[in-house]
């Protein structure tokens, strides 16, 4: 009965606060009958998509609130008849380690960024935070470490691999506790981290009652765009609960200028220009409830859930100009759809004694998405593509830790995952005839099983020496029995791992870290699937396309890329959370995968077609040098800036080199790895004013990449700048304004790319998005 009363009281407090926030936000944004959160109707006719509908869902919870109100801890008779007694309030003081202390105490090299970094610019999505982190940049394939993405950089959510379809660009920083940038793989986490891992730790449950609200406005295409983030943490007895909620919308525009020199519709050389305008709009929400129950002093049960859903539309319109010949143009396009992610993890922790601990986890994941795309020529439908994806997974993991003597902590664990994916898509022409009759409309079903087992020993050799030894075996099998595109692929990797730390003094102000690791990159299901995707510019399968406009197919015979790595870093921890670090890394890679393009006779076309397909191409080497410096200016440069007590500086500079053995130099680098990158940032408290300002400048130079003996890829220099100003309005309220230029929301920086062939054919694309302004109001309620 006591637990029942506690739960109902807790529910009432949560629902009351949520209802107040929803009511306040609704009236703030909807002063009239026409709400600013407009309805977006994807062409696929999905459900109504007003943000106010989400608040309507709170009304459905009202019976629970009423039920909670009917229950009180003490009866009315008890309340009126008992004398009022003074109660000594229990005050809990919680000391939590900061980001610098956590980094210093880690047994392997990692950078940790907490609340200060997450909140500094009032960002609305996690990718905007990540692109300012040292050694991290953001491109079309998401965040990249050391210039390597597309599977080389592993994304983790609470230490587990992020499920397919998880959108970091739709995850609010207010729902994140901290971000860990891990330079080398460890035994407890998946070894699919050739470049490293980015571990996103979602909001944790605390024993303090907290309530925070963030209201934001951001510049959009036609009007300001709203976003709201609310989080509440409550604690009653042994129960702790947290509920972060995020609502967001976007409406942005990107301009593209595309120049082409390639064969036209008649097979003869042609020159063309296209000025494109891409407009994207949509809305979505994230909800991440977490519950902790302390069964006893030794046992804890935790439930962590995450729900994400959004609707989107995208339209591209071109103005075409034929400079010479009969060029082929990209079609105008209208597309829309939705995505949805659901995730739940249950964790049981039992501390048998001070020396023993077991942790067992079980989880379920679901992803759903659907889309339709119309290619238009002269206003008429040229192609119609519709599809949907369904991804379901069950995970189970556990680990047992045992303190052996006073110096060793032994850990053994397992990590199991069973994932099933169902894809279905159909492409028809304007007359409704299937483009590829033998493939269209067929459901692609695949199953992926991942099994990992590991052991680890953390050895405290002395107060100055630490050694972390681990061994992990990970096996991934992918299988599909689809008759048209069968897949059967198995990969198994044994990864020995060693991390050594030497502290020059027991206080750990200076240390050297070294790691020797074996990691790998496994091919995804889409790369294994041999189902062809016809290039939208050359849909006539009786005609040969071009090298620069190839069809795409997968390769079921791909082997995993293997990497042996060495990392060495020196870290000097300064006063006031300052740090200086310099590190080097080296990776030897085998079975490197590269998309290769060649002319083939294929079963689905009567004419030869240019096909691009991933293949295990060659071996490669990559290495780099990384610097990081941050701290108070008066500590870093006392003679020059000793008077600037409120000025903090942050900087990073990284140099990268790579070479693929099968390609001639000098630009035979790994895909997308820039020669160097830099970040320079500051924040300053203005003396005599309740105001803090700051900024960040990121620079990546232009570079060339040799894709093959026939193709070169060129990329221009990119620069992005961020500025912010923050003013506290009261002890519990602050106003923040931020601006960014040179970047695209949810995308790569502004710039141009050039794909050039040895025969002189090329495609050049310039992308530009307007600067963004963001205003946020933070309140502790």
Which residue stretches match the model-derived regions?
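Short acidic/polar hinge/loop motifs at secondary-structure boundaries
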Residues: 160-186
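N-terminal periplasmic "start-of-domain" segments of outer-membrane beta-barrel proteins
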Residues: 89-121, 150-155, 206
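Face-selective signature of the C-terminal outer-membrane beta-barrel domain
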Residues: 288-310, 334-481, 503-509, 626-634, ...
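Extracytoplasmic beta-strand/coil segments of soluble accessory domains associated
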Residues: 94, 110, 127-161, 183
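Outer-membrane beta-barrel signature, preferentially recognizing the C-terminal barrel domain
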Residues: 333-342, 389, 442-449, 518-581, ...
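N-terminal periplasmic accessory domains that precede
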Residues: 126-129, 143-144, 181, 193-215, ...
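Transmembrane beta-barrel wall of Gram-negative outer-membrane proteins
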Residues: 222-255, 267-316, 335-353
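Gram-negative outer-membrane beta-barrel transporters
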Residues: 581, 585-588, 606-703
């Amino acid at each position: 009965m006591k637990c029942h009363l506690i739960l109902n009281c807790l529910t009432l407090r949560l629902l009351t606060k949520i209802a107040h926030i929803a009511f306040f936000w609704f009236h703030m944004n909807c002063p009239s009958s026409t709400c600013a959160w407009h309805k977006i109707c994807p062409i696929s006719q999905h459900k109504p998509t007003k943000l106010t509908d989400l608040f309507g869902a709170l009304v459905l919870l009202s019976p629970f609130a009423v039920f909670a109100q009917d229950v009180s801890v003490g009866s009315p008779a008890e309340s009126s008849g008992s004398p009022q007694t003074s109660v000594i309030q229990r005050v809990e003081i919680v000391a939590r380690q900061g980001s610098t202390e956590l980094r210093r105490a880690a047994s392997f090299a990692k950078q940790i960024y907490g609340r200060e970094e997450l909140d500094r610019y009032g960002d609305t999505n996690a990718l905007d935070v990540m692109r300012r982190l040292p050694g991290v940049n953001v491109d079309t394939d998401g965040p990249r470490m050391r210039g390597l993405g597309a599977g080389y950089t592993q994304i983790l959510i609470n230490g587990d691999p992020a499920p397919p379809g998880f959108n970091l660009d739709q995850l609010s920083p207010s729902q994140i506790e901290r971000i860990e940038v891990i330079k080398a793989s460890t035994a407890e986490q998946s070894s699919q981290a050739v470049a490293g891992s980015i571990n996103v730790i979602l909001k944790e449950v605390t024993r303090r009652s907290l309530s925070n609200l963030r209201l934001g406005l951001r510049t959009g295409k036609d009007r300001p765009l709203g976003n709201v983030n609310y989080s509440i943490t409550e604690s009653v007895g042994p129960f702790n609960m947290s509920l972060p909620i995020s609502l967001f919308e976007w409406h942005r525009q990107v301009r593209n200028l595309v120049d082409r020199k390639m064969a036209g519709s008649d097979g003869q050389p042609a020159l063309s220009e296209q000025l494109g305008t891409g407009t994207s709009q949509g809305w979505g929400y994230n909800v991440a409830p977490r519950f902790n129950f302390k069964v006893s002093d030794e046992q804890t049960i935790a439930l962590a859930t995450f729900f994400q859903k959004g609707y989107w539309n995208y339209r591209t319109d071109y103005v075409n100009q034929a400079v010479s010949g009969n060029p082929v143009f990209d079609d105008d396009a209208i597309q829309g759809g939705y995505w949805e992610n659901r995730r739940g993890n249950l964790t049981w922790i039992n501390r048998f004694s001070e020396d023993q601990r077991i942790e067992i986890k079980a989880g379920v994941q679901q992803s759903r998405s659907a889309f339709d795309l119309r290619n238009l020529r002269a206003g008429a439908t040229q192609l119609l593509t519709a599809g949907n994806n369904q991804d379901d997974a069950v995970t189970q993991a556990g680990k047992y830790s045992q303190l052996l003597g006073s110096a060793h902590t032994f850990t053994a664990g397992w990590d199991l995952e069973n994932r099933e994916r169902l894809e279905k898509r159909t492409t028809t022409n304007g007359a409704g005839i299937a483009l590829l009759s033998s493939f269209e409309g067929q459901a692609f079903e695949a199953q992926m099983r991942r099994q990992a087992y590991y052991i680890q020993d953390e050895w405290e050799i002395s107060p100055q020496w630490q050694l972390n030894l681990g061994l992990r075996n990970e096996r991934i099998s992918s299988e599909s029995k689809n008759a048209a595109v069968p897949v059967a692929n198995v990969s198994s990797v044994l990864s020995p791992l060693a991390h050594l730390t030497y502290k020059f003094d027991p206080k750990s102000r200076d240390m050297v870290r070294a790691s020797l690791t074996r990691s790998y990159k496994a091919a995804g299901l889409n790369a294994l699937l041999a189902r062809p995707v016809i290039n939208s510019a050359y849909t006539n399968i009786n005609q040969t396309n071009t090298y620069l406009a190839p069809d795409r197919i997968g390769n079921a015979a791909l082997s995993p890329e293997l990497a042996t790595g060495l990392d060495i870093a020196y870290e000097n921890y300064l006063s006031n959370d300052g740090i200086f670090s310099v590190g080097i890394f080296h990776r030897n890679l085998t079975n490197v995968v590269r998309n290769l393009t060649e002319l083939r006779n294929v079963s689905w076309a009567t004419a030869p077609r240019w096909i691009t397909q991933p293949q295990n191409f060659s071996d490669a080497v990559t290495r780099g040098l990384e610097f990081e410096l941050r701290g108070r200016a008066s500590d870093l440069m006392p003679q020059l800036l000793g008077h600037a007590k409120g000025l903090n500086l942050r900087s990073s500079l990284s140099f990268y080199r790579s070479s693929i053995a099968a390609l001639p130099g000098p630009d035979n680098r790994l895909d997308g790895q820039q020669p160097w990158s830099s970040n320079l940032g500051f924040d300053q408290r203005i003396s005599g004013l309740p105001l803090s300002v700051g900024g960040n400048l990121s620079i990546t130079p232009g570079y060339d990449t040799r894709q093959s003996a026939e193709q070169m890829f060129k990329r221009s220099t990119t620069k992005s700048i961020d500025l912010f100003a923050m003013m506290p309005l009261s002890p519990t309220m602050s106003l923040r304004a931020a601006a960014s230029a040179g970047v695209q929301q949810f995308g790569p920086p502004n710039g141009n790319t050039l794909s050039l062939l040895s025969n002189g054919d090329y495609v050049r694309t310039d992308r530009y998005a307007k600067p963004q302004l963001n205003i946020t109001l933070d309140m502790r309620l």
